[in-house]
Each structure stands twice: as structure tokens, then as C-alpha cells.
Amino acid sequence: MVHTIGFIKPDYPGERRVALLPKDIKELENNIAIESGFGREMGISDAAYLKAGAKVMNRKEIFQNCDFIFSLKLLQSNDYQYLRRGQTIIGWTHPYGSGRSFYENECIPRDIKIVDLDNITPRLFYRDRVYDLDYIPRNFVYQNSVIAGFSSTYHALMAYGLMPTSRTKVAILSAGNVAQGAYKAIAHFNSRIRMFYRKTMNEFYATIDEYDVIINGIQVDEPHVNIISKEQLALVKKGCLIIDAAAHQGRAIYGTKFTYLEAPIAQTEGVDYYCLSNSPSLFFRTASKEISKAFTRYIYRPSVDKMMAYLKKEGHPYE
């Protein structure tokens, strides 16, 4: 049986990325339906998607006719009315983070499955079980993470009104994709940069009061464990800007919440921070091309039955 994946425009504040481009709609094992205006941010008409073989529907029709719904970012409350029992929602759904309430309160009662396209460990969530989609390789969309580090750093500096110099001391936490993007951005200013890893974090903590800018690229796995705790925030240099390029609200840095384009800088414990969860959208043209290419290869092209087959496995508990 050939299934249809219905793509809706993300209704998340400031989100401009387009997760599927017409040029990538080829040799797919699933049918494609898009919400009218899906490609507008990229200047792509509905006609271009029709020519590529997709169907075009309005938002309500997508939910009514498609058992598999793709939303790049977490569904917002105005879409809950359209959800149908037994559907599957695919995207950056974050059931262990910002999407926990959505999964537990909206999906589980409706028997809705969730596919979280985490770059490191993509997973399928169903009721009280979690299944690692191990046919999707780690870092399958790493370029979006690099863009996240780059865009977060530039945007945060501009929003804060800070142009670093050769005297600016910068700490970058992690050496992963996000941190690489952050390094690429901050290195343009010839600042004094130190990079720290999980094994060298004690060195960072010993010098935390020296930095003018701290950029975090670490995702926190353990609940109730912060990379920078409340006590450590008290040691941070006055006027220091913390950029959470990993955008792990409340987890990486104590007390943080997501910030938004209209107000990208906030404070926790008197320290200014940046925590925009969709910063790659600032470079949406570049990010859209990378996302569409990677997601087509691993998500859109194989039959969605490949994901659903994991339900026959044991999985592990949702916690």
C-alpha cells in the first residue's frame, strides 16, 4: 500500500524553512501532498509542486486525508482540532523536551504516533514505548546543526549589540556540529577562543568568570542536570552573553526559556542569554536545501511502512 505524507506549513514563530523542494520529489515510495503556499518563503509556487507530482490541499484537507503528517516544527494548539485518531506526526517533535506536553496530552489519548527526527537519534514514539529508527544514520542532517551554530552566534551578537574584537574572550562548549558552526562565525572577529569538551569542562568551570561570550553546543541527556548551573551563573563575568546555540531550554543553562525573533535576548539569574530554537531559519534558503536533500533520502523516499515496522519490535520505555 502506498501512503501519502501530508506536508503543512510550520506555524512556529519566525519559521521560514521549507522542508521539501519540488526538485527532490522523485523516485519516492510515498505519495506527497502539500498545503497550499507551502513553498512561498522560497518563492516556489503550488504549480511547481503539482508539476513535480505532489497534490495540493488546504491545511484542513491535509489532516483529513493524510495518515502521515509532516510538520517541521512542533504543532501548535490551533491544529489540535484537526488531529485524527491513529495518525502519525513526523518532524522535530521533541517528545522529551518542548513537545512532551503535546505528546502526553494530545497524542497518547488519540493513539497518535510521533516520529522525532533528532539528528543524532531519530525515534518513533507510540504510547509508552520508544523505538530507535536505526536505519537512519547519525548526523543525517548535520548541516542544519552547523547552520544553527553559525546563525545563533551572529544573530545573538547583533541582538546584543556586541561586535567582538581581538580582546574578546570566548568559550565554546562542545566540538560537535553546532559548535563548529559557532566557531566558524566567531572566528571572523579574531577573538580569543577556547573550546571545551565534556572531558575538559572542569577547566571551563575554573575559568568561567573570564569570558565575555559563552557559546553552548551541548545537548543535555540527563534530566535535572545543567551544563551551567544556578551556582555557576553567579560566577559569570558581569556583561557576559551566553549563547545557547543548542537551544536546550532550561536544560543546558539553568533557568533559560526559548527566546524568539522579536525578543532574542533574555535573562536568567541576572545573566543575558540567547536561546532561539529555530535560528537556522535566519538562513532559510540554505537550510531548506540541506533539509530537503537529507530528509528526502532518509524520510520521504523510503515507504513510511519502514518506520511503522519498528512497532513490531520491543522498543524501550518512554520516560
Q: Over which residues does each language-model region extend?
A:
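Rossmann-like adenosine-cofactor binding region
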Residues: 199-272
